[in-house]
Amino acid sequence: FVTTGVIKDGFGSMKASDTYYESGTGSTTYHPFSIKKRSAVQFNISAIDRNSGITYAHIEKKENGQWKRIDDTVKIKPASYDDDFVHGLTKGEYRLAIKAPTTQLNAVSYTSSSKSKKVAYKKSKAKKIKLDGQTSNIYTTGEKTSRWYKISITSTKKKRILNLGKNTVSG
């Protein structure tokens, strides 16, 4: 496939749903972005040149005027396309840190979808999941409390399957 874009070294701040191209510098470059409300933020970084080295990325949050790292480093292999990582982020100022070899070209983008905080923290207020229903939510960085859900079984003669899943990144 063929794609077009502008390669801009140190492209600076980022907007959701825009794709940026950056050639590696050998050192870390920072790309600020802001989150207006609690969201699931998905980053897509593609290391385009198959003959170049590995690209590394992580997220930092601005707290009390200082940048604080909030996750572990993500490793993007050469010629890998659509390497995504997702974070649950609260309102605030963030930046994406990327370190790539000087011979690597990276395509970078992110999308953000707001998530409500309508969850039950107590067993007595557990959120009901209906038959054939589903629910999803996020934990933002630093959240450690339990969430409660309940299901109702209407018949003892039918088998019901409960599928639980999780997607995680460290942070």
Spell out what each predicted region is.
Residues 21-93, 99-101, 140-171:
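Acidic, Ser/Thr/Pro-rich low-complexity intrinsically disordered segments
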Residues 1-32, 37, 110-157:
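Non-catalytic extracellular/lumenal accessory regions of secreted precursors
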Residues 104-108:
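Extracellular and select intracellular beta-sandwich modules with Ser/Thr-enriched
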